[in-house]
Regions:
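Short helix-loop capping/hinge motifs at secondary-structure junctions, enriched
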Residues: 30-33, 167-169, 190
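A conserved C-terminal secondary-structure "cap"
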Residues: 188-212
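Non-catalytic surface loops within mature trypsin-like serine protease
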Residues: 26, 186-188
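Short beta-strand scaffold segments in enzyme catalytic cores
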Residues: 8, 21-24, 60, 159-161, ...
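CN hydrolase (nitrilase-like) catalytic-core segments centered on the catalytic cysteine
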Residues: 3-7, 68, 74-179
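Hydrophobic residues at beta-strand termini and immediately following loops
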Residues: 35, 62, 132, 172, ...
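Active-site catalytic loop in hydrolytic enzyme cores
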Residues: 13-98, 102-120, 195-196
């Protein structure tokens, strides 16, 4: 028995296709299913389009022993549509396993922006967000495929948990592996979502332009 529910990221091969995938393992050890990453980045340091195809599962919500969770993967977290899609499917908590780091080409620290994007998802959907990011440095070794470039990407950790208003309630630092914890009353949060009326007052028939 695990006595906890865990999203587990892995690289999945399906015949001749590769996916960036997460499986959700429930407290009794059962596999509740998988989600395949929807948004695939293509950047100097995140060249996933060379390897992965876009996911075909659609956004998923998993009914775990401790509540209904939605899971997006890394680049998915920058799209508000990801969070809202999981929210309208009944998610009570949003999880984002992540591998993001310094932006040497842009010469900026994207960590605060990264956090604020997901704090906004929490506030807009009135549910906690849990983001787990890796630490450490990976070096790019010169080769023919990358034009002989040598570079390095330092992942900035800073994993965090927000409450349903987007306020940070737990956070890790940039350089060490840490376990962070928070406790939520799902019934209380559901009452809070209902009292705000955000989902009651949605007008999906007016949102067609964002799907173009």
């Amino acid at each position: 028995m695990l006595f906890r529910s865990i999203p587990v990221s892995f690289y999945e091969k399906d015949v001749n296709r590769l996916f960036n995938t997460v499986a959700v393992i429930d407290a009794d050890g059962s596999n509740l299913g998988i989600y395949r990453k929807t948004h695939i980045p293509d950047d100097h340091y995140y060249q996933e389009k060379f390897y992965f195809v876009p996911g075909d599962t659609g956004f998923q919500v998993f009914d775990t022993a401790y509540g209904k969770i939605g899971v997006g993967i890394c680049w998915d977290q920058w799209f508000p549509e990801t969070a809202r899609a999981m929210a309208v499917k009944g998610a009570e908590l949003l999880f984002y396993p992540t591998a993001i780091g310094s932006e040497p080409i842009l010469e900026c620290d994207s960590m605060p922006h990264w956090r604020r994007a997901m704090q906004g998802h929490a506030a807009a959907n009135l549910m906690p967000v849990i983001a787990a990011n890796r630490i450490g440095t990976e070096e790019v070794v010169p080769c023919e495929e990358n034009g002989g470039q040598r570079s390095a990407l330092t992942f900035y950790g800073s994993s965090f948990i927000t409450d349903q208003t987007g306020e940070l309630v737990a956070e890790a630092d940039r350089k060490t592996e840490q376990v962070i914890l928070a406790t939520f009353d799902l019934n209380e949060m559901q009452e809070n979502r209902l009292s705000w009326g955000i989902f009651r007052d949605r007008r999906p028939e007016c949102y067609g332009d964002i799907c173009k």
